[in-house]
Amino acid sequence: MNWRSERIWVEFITGSRKISNFCWAFILFLGSSGFLLVGISSYLGKNFISLFPPQQILFFPQGLVMSFYGIAGLFISAYLWCAISWNVGSGYDRFDRKEGIVCIFRWGFPGKNRRIFFRYLIKDIQSIRIELKEGIYTRRVLYLEIRGQGAIPLTRTDENLTPREMEQKAAELAYFLRVPIEVF
């Protein structure tokens, strides 16, 4: 969802709360729980999973390795669930022509850098830069080129905008900010 008026443009950025992250976290949790359960059942010699008897899987080395994979998968799943609950990467880009300020805000992981906030003057914006790399790993990213600061990405690398959508977004933003467009 974006909001735009004559002098202010606010673009909201989705973070970790995407359907794909929910799916991966859920699948990883189920799979790693299964691996850990098989490892524990082979260690104890009891049948916790009715698909096969525990005597078919020896604890050393198969049960031990499956337990390790299960524990590692649970840690990765917990990391994904934490990133989803904290909504890491979400935020907004606010372009305010009235005040002459660009504000970029993102949520990070808890700690010192939980709130990531950048503020620049519009007069310091050199250009809007489009980076297009086609091939097996396509990459289409929109950057805000700031004098003395370098380039700041405005779109995520996994956003998958078509070249036409990318050009349209860059043209609208460049027109709004009254800066040129560069293509790399």
Curated annotation (Swiss-Prot):
Keywords: Chloroplast, Membrane, Photosynthesis, Plastid, Thylakoid, Transmembrane, Transmembrane helix
Signal peptide residues on this chain, from the entry's feature table: none
Cellular compartments per GO CC: chloroplast thylakoid membrane; photosystem I
Localization of this protein: Plastid, Chloroplast thylakoid membrane
Residues passing through the membrane, by range: 21-43, 63-85
Gene Ontology biological-process entries: photosynthesis
InterPro entries named among the record's database cross-references: PSI_Ycf4_assembly (IPR003359)
Disulfide pattern: none
Top-rank lineage group of the source organism: Eukaryota
Function, as annotated: Seems to be required for the assembly of the photosystem I complex.
PANTHER family membership: PHOTOSYSTEM I ASSEMBLY PROTEIN YCF4, PTHR33288
Name the record gives this protein: Photosystem I assembly protein Ycf4
